[in-house]
Amino acid sequence: MASPGVYLFTRKGRRAYVGRSDRDVVARTRSSYRQGDYDLTITVYETASARQAYLLECRLFHRHRPCDNDIHPAVPAGTNWRCPVKGCPWS
């Protein structure tokens, strides 16, 4: 069954990219993974809601500062959610 969630790709053992799906994290992981760019090990966190996925993605983005994430995670369309990390301009 599809669920929202967050995923982490690594390169040479270091966090390189954090992403999320508000509907189906496994499908999103499959479509986003580029063999040769990332290690074969992928970390996936399923969440109970799109909101939880967004909040977790923000926390992981700030904690790991992945080199392949150029910008802060986007707020899902139609929501006014804020980043949970204190001091972030998106909070």
Residue ranges and their predicted role:
Residues M1-R15, S21-S91:
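Boundary/linker segments flanking structured domains
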